[in-house]
């Protein structure tokens, strides 16, 4: 079975830190976690995959295409959630959604409403009024509303209590099963 994501020999150096020869593949309809202590390079790996930081060498093949050569096309097929994001804290969810949906050619309003209802989110609330768990659920609703085939999640369970963390992991399993989606996430919690 062809990998949804194949990372080959990614290298990125910073003063006092280096990612060296990071390689792995993610099969369709699977969940893969990057687990390590703080500062181990999990977020840097995800950012290098997404070209948010430029790796010095290596390649990323996503959906059988070179990600760096087909970045815009590939990004239409993925959902990205970075933990600890408090973007637009004073904006209502409905406002954030109205802006976000403009970036996706395959945005599905019915799908979005399904997840808003499923996650019991109130679109009239401001982002800062949500708990950490509800923030992640909202960001997942956004990510899944354009039929993402791959979710890349950085520390999605960070700051969650054990019950909320387990609920979120259950949601991940449901998404992979029902949405035919793969998930790559980072965490320092095992």
Descriptions of predicted regions:
Residues 7-10, 17-27, 34-35, 58:
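Conserved beta-strand
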Residues 36-41:
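Walker A (P-loop) phosphate-binding loop of ABC-type ATPase nucleotide-binding domains
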Residues 50:
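Helix-to-loop junction immediately C-terminal to a conserved catalytic motif
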Residues 58-69, 73-74:
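Conserved ABC transporter NBD signature motif
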Residues 72, 76, 80-139:
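ABC-family P-loop ATPase nucleotide-binding domains
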Residues 151-155:
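Catalytic Walker B motif of ABC-type/P-loop ATPase nucleotide-binding domains
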Residues 157-158, 190:
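Short loop immediately C-terminal to the Walker-B catalytic DE motif
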Residues 162-164:
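Helix N-cap at the start of a conserved alpha-helix in ABC-type nucleotide-binding domains
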């Amino acid at each position: 079975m062809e990998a949804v994501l194949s990372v080959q020999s990614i290298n990125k150096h910073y003063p006092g830190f280096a990612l060296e020869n990071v390689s792995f593949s993610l099969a369709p309809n699977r969940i893969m976690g990057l687990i390590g202590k703080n500062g181990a390079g999990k977020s840097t790996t995800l950012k290098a995959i997404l070209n948010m930081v430029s790796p010095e060498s290596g390649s990323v093949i996503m959906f059988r295409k070179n990600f760096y050569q087909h970045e815009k096309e590939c990004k239409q097929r993925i959902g990205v959630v970075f933990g600890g994001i408090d973007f637009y804290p004073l904006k209502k969810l409905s406002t954030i959604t109205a802006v976000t949906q403009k970036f996706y050619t395959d945005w599905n309003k019915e799908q979005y409403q399904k997840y808003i209802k499923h996650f019991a989110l109130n679109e009239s609330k401001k982002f800062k009024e949500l708990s950490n768990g509800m923030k992640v659920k909202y960001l997942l609703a956004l990510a899944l509303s354009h039929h993402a085939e791959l979710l890349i999640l950085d520390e999605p369970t960070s700051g969650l209590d054990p019950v909320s963390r387990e609920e979120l992991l259950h949601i991940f399993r449901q998404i992979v099963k029902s949405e035919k989606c793969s998930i790559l996430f980072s965490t320092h919690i095992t």
